[in-house]
Amino acid sequence: MEFRFETDYNLETLTAMAKGLRQTVRKKRSRRTRIFAGIVLVIGLVSTALSIASKEPLRARNLLVPLAMLNVIYASLQEDRLNGRVAKRNVLPGTEHASCVFGEDGYTIKTSVTESKFSYAQILAVAELPRYLVLALSNNQAQAFDKESLSGGTIEEFRAFLADKTGKPVQQIK
């Protein structure tokens, strides 16, 4: 059985890849980062509340702490999009579009500049988002496949095929 995908690596795809990595192989690190961000926010809130309560004169520090807190909140809420933007800057010319063929022994990804072969043993985790399937190869490398472009079978058949070949469950991510 052979499955085929055509994927454009745009900001939406790269954001999905970042989300897939964050919720699979980076899960523990992501949790620690969010706990740290929460602690920073609590310290900032206490500091701001104390400066307001003491009625001290307006200083740059009084404005910088809330501004830093807003930045932490924004970065926490937009983490995947920010990582997607960084990844978009690092996409090599000619690799913005990829064709992939999944076969019995492995899968092959072709772009306008290269052709790469991968074995299923390299896959650490499989994540399924509403539009994409994400294969995590390491903490910093993933591949996304647009489910709308699937040919050669249904998404259910491909999900079962991947679970069989990798020995890993397909994790559903919203």
List each language-model region with its residue ranges.
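Generic beta-strand structural signal
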Residues: 101-102, 128, 137
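Conserved beta-hairpin
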Residues: 75-117
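Hydrophobic alpha-helical transmembrane segments
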Residues: 55-69
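Short, surface-exposed beta-strand-loop junctions and turns on beta-sheet-rich folds
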Residues: 115-117, 124-126, 140-143, 151
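A membrane-cytosol interface segment of integral membrane proteins
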Residues: 132-174
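Phosphoinositide-dependent membrane-docking surfaces
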Residues: 107, 116-133
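Single-pass alpha-helical transmembrane signal-anchor segments
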Residues: 45, 66-75
